[in-house]
Curated annotation (Swiss-Prot):
GO biological process: Golgi to endosome transport; protein transport
Residue positions, PTM N-acetylserine: S2
Segments of skewed composition (Polar residues): 522-538
InterPro entries: ARM-type_fold, DCB_dom, Mon2/Sec7/BIG1-like_HDS, Mon2/Sec7/BIG1-like_HUS, Mon2_C
Region (Disordered): 511-538
One Pfam family matching this protein: DCB
Official protein name in the record: Protein MON2 homolog
Recorded GO CC terms: cytosol; early endosome membrane; extracellular exosome
Family the UniProt entry places it in: Belongs to the MON2 family.
Amino acid sequence: MSGTSSPEAVKKLLENMQSDLRALSLECKKKFPPVKEAAESGIIKVKTIAARNTEILAALKENSSEVVQPFLMGCGTKEPKITQLCLAAIQRLMSHEVVSETAAGNIINMLWQLMENSLEELKLLQTVLVLLTTNTVVHDEALSKAIVLCFRLHFTKDNITNNTAAATVRQVVTVVFERMVAEDERHRDIIEQPVLVQGNSNRRSVSTLKPCAKDAYMLFQDLCQLVNADAPYWLVGMTEMTRTFGLELLESVLNDFPQVFLQHQEFSFLLKERVCPLVIKLFSPNIKFRQGSSTSSSPAPVEKPYFPICMRLLRVVSVLIKQFYSLLVTECEIFLSLLVKFLDADKPQWLRAVAVESIHRFCVQPQLLRSFCQSYDMKQHSTKVFRDIVNALGSFIQSLFLVPPTGNPATSNQAGNNNLGGSVSAPANSGMVGIGGGVTLLPAFEYRGTWIPILTITVQGSAKATYLEMLDKVEPPTIPEGYAMSVAFHCLLDLVRGITSMIEGELGELETECQTTTEEGSSPTQSTEQQDLQSTSDQMDKEIVSRAVWEEMVNACWCGLLAALSLLLDASTDEAATENILKAELTMAALCGRLGLVTSRDAFITAICKGSLPPHYALTVLNTTTAATLSNKSYSVQGQSVMMISPSSESHQQVVAVGQPLAVQPQGTVMLTSKNIQCMRTLLNLAHCHGAVLGTSWQLVLATLQHLVWILGLKPSSGGALKPGRAVEGPSTVLTTAVMTDLPVISNILSRLFESSQYLDDVSLHHLINALCSLSLEAMDMAYGNNKEPSLFAVAKLLETGLVNMHRIEILWRPLTGHLLEVCQHPNSRMREWGAEALTSLIKAGLTFNHDPPLSQNQRLQLLLLNPLKEMSNINHPDIRLKQLECVLQILQSQGDSLGPGWPLVLGVMGAIRNDQGESLIRTAFQCLQLVVTDFLPTMPCTCLQIVVDVAGSFGLHNQELNISLTSIGLLWNISDYFFQRGETIEKELNKEEAAQQKQAEEKGVVLNRPFHPAPPFDCLWLCLYAKLGELCVDPRPAVRKSAGQTLFSTIGAHGTLLQHSTWHTVIWKVLFHLLDRVRESSTTADKEKIESGGGNILIHHSRDTAEKQWAETWVLTLAGVARIFNTRRYLLQPLGDFSRAWDVLLDHIQSAALSKNNEVSLAALKSFQEILQIVSPVRDSDKPETPPVVNVPVPVLIGPISGMSRPFVRTDSIGEKLGRYSSSEPPIVTDELEDLNLWWAAWNTWYRIGSESTKPPITFDKLTFIPSQPFLTALIQIFPALYQHIKTGFNMDDLQKLGVILHSAISVPISSDASPFILPSYTEAVLTSLQEAVLTALDVLQKAICVGPENMQIMYPAIFDQLLAFVEFSCKPPQYGQLETKHIANAKYNQIQLFAPAEWVALNYVPFAERSLEVVVDLYQKTACHKAVVNEKVLQNIIKTLRVPLSLKYSCPSESTWKLAVSSLLRVLSIGLPVARQHASSGKFDSMWPELANTFEDFLFTKSIPPDNLSIQEFQRNENIDVEVVQLISNEILPYANFIPKEFVGQIMTMLNKGSIHSQSSSFTEAEIDIRLREEFSKMCFETLLQFSFSNKVTTPQEGYISRMALSVLLKRSQDVLHRYIEDERLSGKCPLPRQQVTEIIFVLKAVSTLIDSLKKTQPENVDGNTWAQVIALYPTLVECITCSSSEVCSALKEALVPFKDFMQPPASRVQNGES
């Protein structure tokens, strides 16, 4: 229910009506009674209707004539207040649609009266509008009268009324046509749609039209009549009308209700018959008028164009063409031709402006333009309307730049401002605004001094006109400067945008349809097959038609567009404008490309290319015929010939870059403007977005880009992207900050351009690749014989293109890489470098790309990708090879796991590096190899392992870089470790391969040839490895030899157990002995010249400063390694059959090395000797885990951590298991003891030969005499114990003699003065040298063996004693080495070594050695004293005889410790030996020993050597105690057994004791020491012993007692004499002191007396002779006389002497007690 018919609304309406009628009644009460009555009856009428009817509104409408009557009467009063009240009430009724047709007629008549009386004009208009808009009851004459009323009010004198009336008319006209449209809608389903009117239809009768349509028809017909200044048929009563208003009304109807004219033939007829002729007639003044033409030539004055009419006509024309083009084809052709004419230069500027605005309206409607093309341009004899429009715009734009000739009246009042469209000849800086010292350009076009500003007139894509909308203007407006140019510019842009988007949209739809059809057609069913064929055929027909239209449109417009756009591009000073022009050119080029229009495509591309480059830039590719035809083409526009203006490039543009042109001959610099850069970006955009349609024009595009990139100084970076180069590279390149910020963007777009090549089809891609290759060839030609930097653009872009097309790389790989390989061989290094960069980058990318199927399943593709890498090996340029190797390295790092069949190729690249190709190449290749060995051995086929070994070995032999050689050896170790760990797998795979090869060989009838055949393939692999290491072991460089040697032996040691048993024969004879022979030969022939330190900063140690010394090291290492293998692998070698021969060869090598004059070699030979002697019984250690033998010197650090070197190997090769491989499951046990013994005796003979040869003193001595070193001799002697263990069963006296000679000779060898500080201990250290220790050890081993050995061995004891005693003698008499003169170390008491420069050789300090030997003698004698051989061979006598020497020397011994040790040893030996001697007294075997012993005592106790001056008192006392010990021994061990001892000997002993008791004084001592230095204790001991044995009642012979008595008598007599003399001299001297000697003597005598008395008292009384007592007592008076002496010392001694006499003061008890015997 609508808002006006709801119960509430109706109720309110009734209330309002009643109140209106009451108000009317009240107003008319006095003056107009009839009206009052009518109003009151009206109230009753309304109430009645409301009461009686349910449908109140319908009842009201039925009775509306009566209901409105009171109000009409009220209006008739002409009273303003009443009239207003009534009109408001009537409007209310109308708005509720309760007015019938009759009532409406009455109302209109009443309104007409009010109009004629000029009353309430605005209210009238409002009422009419309400009446006509709220219902459709008003028709025919009533409607026409209402419309006329409005027109009449439009022409009053009141402006407000006029304007309101104009608006009302417009609304009413619209309402009339809206009614018609609504009527048509209602009858649409009933009546068929009328056929569209044909152009030649006759006029139809109006009677066929329905009511609303008839009203509309009559109205439109009269509007045409009125505009044509004719009388109207229907709008009767019109008094006045303007043409402008009429045209506006016509335009609005045509614009708003086009369907009315298209659907009704009657209306269509009106269009053709009335509207079009009217428009053409009204255009007449505009067509004929020529600005500036002389009027006199024409017979009648030409009517001037009138702006308001002209502008409205153009609006109408725009609507006619836009809405009714299909109806008015011929008429539209006329209109369009007229429009084009209005653009002529001789037309007023305002006319040109509105005309160009009108054309702009069409340019934004591409479908309309398409219709023009189809209707005119494509018809054979028709005007080429579309082409003419485009050309006219171009001519119009060109004309604006042509300054009019002088004398031509520029303006006319009627025509408006002539300069409006544009040209202003301006000063040079016109359009520039100074800002802060800089200059900012206003947007403008500037060409040859003509400056035209660019105005912002509309949004792109919409034609919002300015002057076509000036409906209020009567006079022509003043057109702003540049307006017409701006609109024309927009026309071009919108035209291009519209056409291109339309065609591309349709193309897209067509392609989609084709695709859909194809997809559906791919599985047609039988029933629809025919149907599909039909639709496909229709599709093709449609496409042919569409394509013909598109091509015609482009062909019609491209020349004009290009001419205009090129001119504008050249003239543009505004970035935005330039951008728009370029965008238009780009879209046209792309469209032409899509349609396959090559000429036009290339023309647009050429234009962009030329815009990108500096003016007149010499680029041949752009100066083709295509471009030439363009520059001179003229277009005929309306009979005028307009030449294309060629670009002048004089426009003021900011220069942003200055650079060098890319040419063979250097030219001056060229300048790039910001516009050039903008064009470049467009070119990039074109190529990026439309690469698929460029085809052959890629050549144009890329050539231009290459030149721009060159001028801007962009250089390729990784991946082919271009980045700004360094300033250094182009000193003539100057870039402003403006362009610097652009460069990264340009670079980015360039990259994206080539990235987008991945979306090109294969053919387009080949076009691109071919274009790049030919560009590259040009660049290569330019770079020949030219030092100038080459252009790398093409190469960089080939790379980028390849990278993004990896998914289909196969189709372009060969041409791409083939060309890049050519580039790699170019003489220009920069060019080459980039060729290699591109090639390697492509290979790497190809291998990492995720192909489908993957490379692992597509070996052909993998090898195709890798092949160029191999081809690079044929190029000799080192920089290319370096790139190649770096590429290999990166391939390994990224793809190493999946190379598979590509391995031989990759390894071949590494191995192809020759020694002469420079250090960096070798280093890079080697890095690759390192990576292979560390990471990829498990992933490669086992057949490639030998190649790896060969390549690694070849790097070892390269002599450019030592570290590489050393590290390659480390790699060989790693490889061997890998073989070891993966042995089973490798062996299986190799055997399988071998079987296959064997089969092939048999089929071909050839012999399978491989190294070390017929060893198994896995063993051959090992042997190849050993052979490689063997080669390296004799390399000229010492470090390489050393490392290779260590590795070889470590490898054999660690992994040798994997070899088949038979293969060991090859290892020993072909690898090891062959190597030893070569090393020995090289060592013996090596140069002895000193090698200077290399490079000044590498110091060569003196031990390595000759080639000979360096080879010595190798010899050492090799020999040690071989010996180690013989030791550890003997269980494998011994069963081979010729082991004893191999043993002899090894011993021979050891002997020759040991006898080498090089200390290092000789010493090492002995160490090797030791090694082979420490062999344990085979197989005993099979349960122990084994670690590989490590050679003394670790593998060089350069190699880094070598896997496996320090890792213990799990004993998978436990000897038991391994031997199972060789024979039976039981390991062989060596049972042939005899053979073993022969091996050891061969070793003994070798040892003896080495020992005797090396220790034999030379006959003559000079500076170069070779004397073996101490370490050598030590090692030699140290070998004996180990060797002896094997030969002891057969070791006899002769062998002992041989041994003794060698020991004696070895110990006698002096040492070099250089080495002495390191070997000689100082005298304070009683340290033995290693050699001395070794000698004693050897003897110790022997004596221990003799001790436990059989009886026949024990006869060797004396020989051992002789050897030891000979060594003891060295303590006082060092041995002589031949005739060699040696310096001895200084006297022991100074406790230091003094080495004198002239002496070359220094004798050792033999004292500690001799002393240790003595200790050994004593110990051994303790064990063997009673042994028969020891007794028979007079060993004890020999010992005493040997000891006599140091004992007699005593203080003169080189070392004080010697004589002390000699004494203690003598005492120990005698304590053991004397009982044995007494035991054998009768045999006479010891007779000669006693005199020797007596002489020894004599020499020691009464030595001729004097104590040193610095001997301390305490030391003297200690020495005296030693003397006392000797006397005690005599007392305890000799004298008690005098019966068993020769008498001569006893007599000698007694004489000695006697002598000791008297002559014990020392000759040199101070007064202070006198009481100590007199050897009192010794004297006492001698006395006591003498007395003990003198008075012993055991004395058996008178002779013995006589000796004693005589000794006492002499002693006492001498004492008496000394005392008497002293007393006498004391008395005579008076106060003068006596001489010192005499005082000393008297003191000594007094002490001797006291000692004697003490001794006598202690002795048994029966042993003392009475006569002796008498002599003692007789001394007493003399002693008393001495009391008067003045010397305190004498007094003190006298006191001590007198005290003992107290015992004699007692009266004797009886004579018997004291009596004689």
